[in-house]
C-alpha cells in the first residue's frame, strides 16, 4: 500500500477516567481540542490510552463514539496489538468494523518472538483486515525489536503501510528508510527524536 495514512503529528490520546468508568464528555472535548489545534491523526486505545487494560466493551464504545464524532475530519487509528496473534486479529477486525481508518499493532510482548515469528504475526493480522496497518516497535516495553530487514519484508504486504519506530535508534530509522523506500512510512515514536527522524525522511511522529 503506497499511500501513507497521514504525515505530521499523530497523537496517542489518553483515555479519561472517573471512578465509575470512562469519562466520555472529557474524551469528546479532548478530541475536539486536538482537531482544532491541527493534530493530523488520532490514536485510540494504544499505550498512552491504556488499551491493554480496557475491557472489550470499553474499547468498542470508545472506538464507536470517537469515529462517529470525528466523522472523517482526521484519520482515527486504533491500537489493536497483543502477544496473542488471534487476539490481535480479533481486536483489529473489531476496530475496522467500527470504522477505524487504520490499526496500530505492537510487536508481541513477553514471548520474545524471532524475526521470522514477527513477520508471521504481522502478516496474519494484515491478511485479516482491509485497512492500513502500522507496526509499533517499542522494545523497551516488549522485549523484542524488529530489524530493518524485517520491515523490508513486511513492506511488501499491501496493507502494511509503515512503522511507529520507538526503539530510539536513528540508525534503525535510516536503514529502514533506505531498505523500504517511499511506500513504507516511518513515524518516530519518541517525541524527542521527531525532528531528526523527519530530516532523515520520516513521515512525522506518533506520540
What spans do the regions from the language model cover?
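Active-site beta->alpha loop and helix N-cap motifs at the rims of alpha/beta catalytic domains
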Residues: 2-143
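Catalytic alpha/beta core domains of metabolic enzymes, predominantly
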Residues: 124-128, 139-207
Amino acid at each position: 500500500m503506497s499511500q501513507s495514512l497521514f504525515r505530521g503529528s499523530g497523537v496517542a490520546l489518553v483515555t479519561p477516567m472517573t471512578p465509575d468508568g470512562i469519562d466520555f464528555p472529557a474524551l469528546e472535548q479532548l478530541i475536539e481540542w486536538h482537531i482544532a489545534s491541527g493534530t493530523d491523526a488520532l490514536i485510540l486505545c494504544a499505550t498512552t490510552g491504556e488499551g491493554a487494560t480496557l475491557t472489550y466493551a470499553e474499547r468498542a464504545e470508545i472506538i464507536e463514539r470517537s469515529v462517529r464524532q470525528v466523522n472523517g475530519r482526521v484519520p482515527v487509528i486504533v491500537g489493536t496489538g497483543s502477544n496473542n496473534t488471534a487476539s490481535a486479529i480479533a481486536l483489529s477486525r473489531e476496530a475496522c468494523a467500527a470504522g477505524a481508518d487504520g490499526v496500530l499493532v505492537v510487536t508481541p510482548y513477553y514471548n520474545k518472538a524471532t524475526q521470522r515469528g514477527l513477520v508471521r504475526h504481522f502478516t496474519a493480522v494484515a491478511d485479516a483486515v482491509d485497512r492500513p496497518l502500522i507496526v509499533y516497535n517499542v522494545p523497551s516495553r516488549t522485549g523484542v525489536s524488529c530489524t530493518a530487514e524485517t520491515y523490508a519484508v513486511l513492506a511488501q504486504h499491501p496493507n502494511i503501510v509503515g512503522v511507529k519506530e520507538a526503539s530510539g535508534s536513528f540508525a534503525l530509522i535510516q536503514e529502514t528508510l533506505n531498505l523500504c523506500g517511499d511506500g513504507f512510512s516511518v513515524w518516530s515514536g519518541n517525541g524527542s527524536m521527531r525532528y531528526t527522524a523527519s530530516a532523515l525522511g520520516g513521515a512525522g511522529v506518533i506520540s
